[in-house]
Swiss-Prot record:
<dbReference type="GO" id="GO:0010874">
    <property type="term" value="P:regulation of cholesterol efflux"/>
</dbReference>
<dbReference type="GO" id="GO:0010887">
    <property type="term" value="P:negative regulation of cholesterol storage"/>
</dbReference>
<feature type="repeat" description="TPR 1">
    <location>
        <begin position="393"/>
        <end position="426"/>
    </location>
</feature>
<dbReference type="InterPro" id="IPR011990">
    <property type="entry name" value="TPR-like_helical_dom_sf"/>
</dbReference>
<protein>
    <recommendedName>
        <fullName>Tetratricopeptide repeat protein 39B</fullName>
    </recommendedName>
</protein>
<dbReference type="GO" id="GO:0006629">
    <property type="term" value="P:lipid metabolic process"/>
</dbReference>
<dbReference type="Pfam" id="PF10300">
    <property type="entry name" value="Iml2-TPR_39"/>
</dbReference>
<keyword id="KW-0833">Ubl conjugation pathway</keyword>
<dbReference type="GO" id="GO:0090181">
    <property type="term" value="P:regulation of cholesterol metabolic process"/>
</dbReference>
<dbReference type="Pfam" id="PF13181">
    <property type="entry name" value="TPR_8"/>
</dbReference>
<comment type="function">
    <text>Regulates high density lipoprotein (HDL) cholesterol metabolism by promoting the ubiquitination and degradation of the oxysterols receptors LXR (NR1H2 and NR1H3).</text>
</comment>
<feature type="repeat" description="TPR 2">
    <location>
        <begin position="626"/>
        <end position="659"/>
    </location>
</feature>
<keyword id="KW-0677">Repeat</keyword>
<dbReference type="InterPro" id="IPR019412">
    <property type="entry name" value="Iml2/TPR_39"/>
</dbReference>
<dbReference type="GO" id="GO:0042632">
    <property type="term" value="P:cholesterol homeostasis"/>
</dbReference>
<dbReference type="InterPro" id="IPR019734">
    <property type="entry name" value="TPR_rpt"/>
</dbReference>
<comment type="similarity">
    <text>Belongs to the TTC39 family.</text>
</comment>
Amino acid sequence: MDAVLACRLRGRGNRVAALRPRPRPGGSAGPSPFALLCAGLSPEPRAGVGSEFPAWFLGGSSQRRNMALLGSRAELEADEDVFEDALETISISSHSDMATSSLHFASCDTQQAPRQRGASTVSSSSSTKVDLKSGLEECAVALNLFLSNKFTDALELLRPWAKESMYHALGYSTIVVLQAVLTFEQQDIQNGISAMKDALQTCQKYRKKYTVVESFSSLLSRGSLEQLSEEEMHAEICYAECLLQKAALTFVQDENMINFIKGGLKIRTSYQIYKECLSILHEIQKNKLQQEFFYEFEGGVKLGSGAFNLMLSLLPARIIRLLEFIGFSGNRELGLLQLREGASGRSMRSALCCLTILAFHTYISLILGTGEVNVAEAERLLAPFLQQFPNGSLVLFYHARIELLKGNLEEAQEVFQKCISVQEEWKQFHHLCYWELMWINVFQQNWMQAYYYSDLLCKESKWSKATYVFLKAAILSMLPEEDVVATNENVVTLFRQVDSLKQRIAGKSIPTEKFAVRKARRYSASLPAPVKLILPALEMMYVWNGFSIVSKRKDLSENLLVTVEKAEAALQSQNFNSFSVDDECLVKLLKGCCLKNLQRPLQAELCYNHVVESEKLLKYDHYLVPFTLFELASLYKSQGEIDKAIKFLETARNNYKDYSLESRLHFRIQAALHLWRKPSSD
């Protein structure tokens, strides 16, 4: 399969496409219209059957095989055959980053953005095509519109040529897909998939077509990489980006196994395309070949290859070993380097590279990592965006996240509120802010205000109803009974709703929803009476690594410790029941986190050891022991005992399985091992 794909990209004819990409006014090509798109969602085209793999490899009929080898577009309607569709068009979207110093924005006036569609240069041939230069120009304008909160204007600018220009197709479908991901509405998801199919077909028109002889000779020789025309090079990058996004939507569209296979194959094909494009990039640089829009192709390769390297490197060791067996590999340092190089360039994808790095620093490192965040780089990368788009929702959102990670909760609150107020067009951005504001109020123990935002999420967002309802009930559980009555909510009823609200993605339950369902069982109608959860809001705060944020604030850590110690005292006065040991261990874990944040390591260690020593007595919350071992490792690392810390990490990773949130802990262990091991140990 890999050899055949290599043929597609390497054995190109001797065409030197003269489509000159044009530098932006003022000499700088603006950030990709889709850098902005949610910290790293890339464009998303998709195409037909024969062009991705020779038909004889797919096992089609003789007529179909000949059409495929000749690059006929009759193959584009292959969707009826789900397995061939899975083999042919393979994609998943990668998260983007923000990058470095010399970031250039398109100098187009966004006020005039929805300009005349006739501005695009169209070839005079019967088959209408928009040239590369015009496609890049209009995408840069659309990017500025998007970052300026003019989402509909950006769509309308790109829509007229979305079936003729690869970059219009990529930009248009990316915005539609982003909207689908944010709303989680089935109709929006279907619209995203439809837009993605059209985009892939549009990109397919620009990809290299093979004759039978070329297909056969390419199998025997790598050919000359530089023989790929500039337009065809861009078509490969756009096609790969579209495949990634289509794969992402495939996972959320339905939970059946066929969609899971299709999505996985799309990812693999996209990955292989990026590998081949990286080889082409190196060949061009080595031979110093002249291409007018080389910087745009380079930006696309850096974004795709860098994001793949970064994301694959985050995976737990056991998954990495499996993926390496089927041809994947990831290197975190290389991925960050490629993204930083892409971000420092002048391509449209520079902004996407920046946003990918920002997503890594402000979200991924916290939720799936140790909480050790490179805030300085995040601030440096965001600075040019803040200057250019001071009221852009996406820019403000990242600004608020950075303030939050610095412990400036009050400043973060103000910026999140501003992010909500600057636009009404995409309410989904509001939901992201509601989530953050809910947690800020949890950190501050402003329970009524936290309830307000959790209630908004329950009513307006469809991302994870089970999680939202559980959190609302958990927050209400922290309030005095009279305050709960004033809300007209019934905590027991809310907890009992959780199980019916859980969903599946790619055929799998969402780990945090499974966790919420298990915890809510204590309120099941089948029990003689509900057994009240202990500190459920703080437990969820721990699950989302909120104690890492609170560690920057001594006052908040002290207040949380008071709350935990009150719960500890209340437990000691209660009658013993089947949940008592589990509740006691949870309280000890939370107390240990507070003590560690307050620089009281010996007391924290005593709390953690109590949990580990109670392992055999736990009946329900078996996740507490491996997570506590991780906290002990973190404690020892902070005291300079690296070898001891690594030993505890390996114990947590190797000696425990089948507990709640296991994959999340394995992600954190992988991140910690990567950061803490000496270079020689790697």
